[in-house]
Amino acid sequence: MKMDLNSDLGESLGAWRMGDDAAMLGIVSSANVACGFHAGDPAGVLRTLRRARDNGVVVGAHVAYRDLIGFGRRNMDVESADLIADVIYQIGALKGLAAAAGTSVRYVKPHGALYNTIAHDARQAHDVITAIREVDPRLTLVALAGSPLLGWAQDQGLRVVAEAFADRAYTPAGTLVSRREKGAVLHDAKLIAERMLRLVSDGVIEAIDGSLVAIAADSICVHGDNPDAVAVAAQVRTRLTQAGVSIQSFEVAAP
C-alpha cells in the first residue's frame, strides 16, 4: 500500500517568512510550489525548487487567483479569458524556474479559493482544465476527493489525483469546513495521524459532527502555513510507515 504526502511550499515573500520548507521537504513526497500570485517570490521559489530536487521530491504548480493580500483565499469571479491566461502564466513561470533548478513541474494543484471554487464551479473548472491542457496535457491535476472536478478533468483527458487534507475538518458531505468556523483547522499531530491511518486503511474520515465520511484519496496534504505543519507531517509519515504504508509520490521525481 502506498500514499502520497504533499505540502504547500515556496510561500515566503521577501522578508516575510512562511513555513519551514527545508524541514517539510525532508518529510513529504510531493511539493505544491507557489507561483507568485498568492505568495512566493522568484528567489525564494527557486531555493525551494532546488531543495525539492536535492530531496527527490516531486514538484507541482500551486496556481491561484491573483491575490497576494488575501493569500489567495478570497473568492473571485474572474472572467474565463483572464483565468485561463493567469493559470498558463503561473505554470509557465514555475516551469522556467524548475528547469533552472534542475527539476521539472509534474502536476498542478490549485490553491485556496481557486481550489475550492473549481471543485464545484463548472465554468472556472473548465478554464483551469483548458489552461493545463494548453500548457502541457501530460500534467496531472490534484483535486478534492469526491468533487465533480475529478470527472470533468478526466473527460478532458487529464490524469487526476484525489486529495484529502490531514489538518482540516470535514463536513458530513465530504467538503472542507470553512476556515471561518471554529475547529476547521486541526493541530493535534497524534490525532491527525490516526485520522489519516484510518483514511488509508478504511477509506473513511470522521466529520466534524462525528459521522463517518467515505473518502477515496491517493494523496494527503499538510498545509505548510500551519504552525504545527512539520510536527503534523512527521507524525503522519511515521504512523503510516509503521502501518506498512509506503510514502511515495503519484509521479516520478525528475532525475
From Swiss-Prot:
EC number: 3.5.2.9
Recorded superkingdom: Bacteria
Keywords: ATP-binding, Hydrolase, Nucleotide-binding
GO biological process, one term: carbohydrate metabolic process
MF terms (GO), sorted A to Z: 5-oxoprolinase (ATP-hydrolyzing) activity; ATP binding
Hydrolase is among the record's keywords: yes
Record InterPro entries: Glyco_hydro/deAcase_b/a-brl (IPR011330), LamB/YcsF/PxpA-like (IPR005501)
Pfam families, sorted: LamB_YcsF
Gene3D superfamilies referenced in this protein's UniProt entry, alphabetically: Glycoside hydrolase/deacetylase (3.20.20.370)
Reactions that this protein is recorded to catalyse: 5-oxo-L-proline + ATP + 2 H2O = L-glutamate + ADP + phosphate + H(+)
Top EC group: hydrolase
Disulfide cysteine pairs (residue numbers): none
HAMAP family: PxpA
NCBIfam families: PRK05406.1-3 (NF003814), PRK05406.1-5 (NF003816)
Function field: Catalyzes the cleavage of 5-oxoproline to form L-glutamate coupled to the hydrolysis of ATP to ADP and inorganic phosphate.
Quaternary data: Forms a complex composed of PxpA, PxpB and PxpC.
Entry's family note: Belongs to the LamB/PxpA family.
Protein name: 5-oxoprolinase subunit A
Species annotation: Albidiferax ferrireducens (strain ATCC BAA-621 / DSM 15236 / T118)
Gene field: pxpA
